[in-house]
């Protein structure tokens, strides 16, 4: 099975590739996310996912054979406002206060570069997440866990935040940052067999 370059530093995305038995190496892209600040949220993630691939391709030696590059980008949005990764504890607390007792949307785009065809394909997934009403003590407790560090929207659905999430409409793996079905479908369309790793 051919190795994939993962253009992401996300531990969760790495865990998903390991679970699927896909060999990969990580190259962290250097993309200015401010370039997407003036476009619609559902276009933001696709643009950034593509930019991450372009950045990684430019860092590789020109004579290096590049079979596959995979990237993804996730944003959280509510009432047309985008919630990125909180800069500090106060911002993380504000995010959770705005999410509690309400529904927001998580958008993840996956981009896959095929080195044989030199083309990039993308898929975008949206999932609605509803937080139950939370007390100030619950919000403080969650923020004090530190899970908000490095997480879009300031929470991790696959961990302790799940205590307060009452409803998910759509793909849970979209919320964790790499929609598994869409990834599998893209790889299959491009002739990359994930199933080989289990034979």
Region roles according to the model:
Residues 21-38, 120-126:
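Short glycine-rich, Thr/Ser-proximal phosphate-binding strand/loop in the N-terminal lobe
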């Amino acid at each position: 099975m051919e190795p994939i370059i993962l253009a992401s530093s996300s531990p969760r995305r790495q865990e998903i590739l390991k679970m699927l038995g896909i060999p990969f190496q990580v190259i962290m892209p250097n993309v200015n996310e401010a370039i997407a600040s003036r476009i619609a949220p559902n276009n933001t993630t696709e643009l950034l996912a593509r930019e991450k691939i372009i950045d990684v391709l430019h860092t590789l030696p020109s004579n290096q054979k590049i079979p596959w590059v995979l990237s993804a980008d996730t944003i959280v949005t509510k009432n047309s406002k985008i919630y990125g990764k909180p800069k500090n504890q106060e911002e993380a607390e504000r995010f959770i206060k705005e999410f509690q007792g309400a529904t927001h949307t998580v958008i993840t785009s996956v981009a896959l570069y095929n080195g044989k065809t030199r083309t990039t394909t993308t898929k975008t997934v949206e999932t609605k997440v509803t937080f139950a009403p939370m007390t100030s003590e619950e919000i403080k407790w969650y923020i004090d866990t530190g899970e908000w560090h490095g997480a879009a929207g300031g929470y991790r659905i696959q961990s302790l935040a799940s205590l307060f999430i009452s409803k998910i409409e759509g793909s849970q793996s979209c919320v964790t940052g790499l929609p598994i079905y869409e990834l599998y479908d893209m790889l299959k369309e491009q002739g990359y067999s994930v199933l080989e790793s289990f034979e």
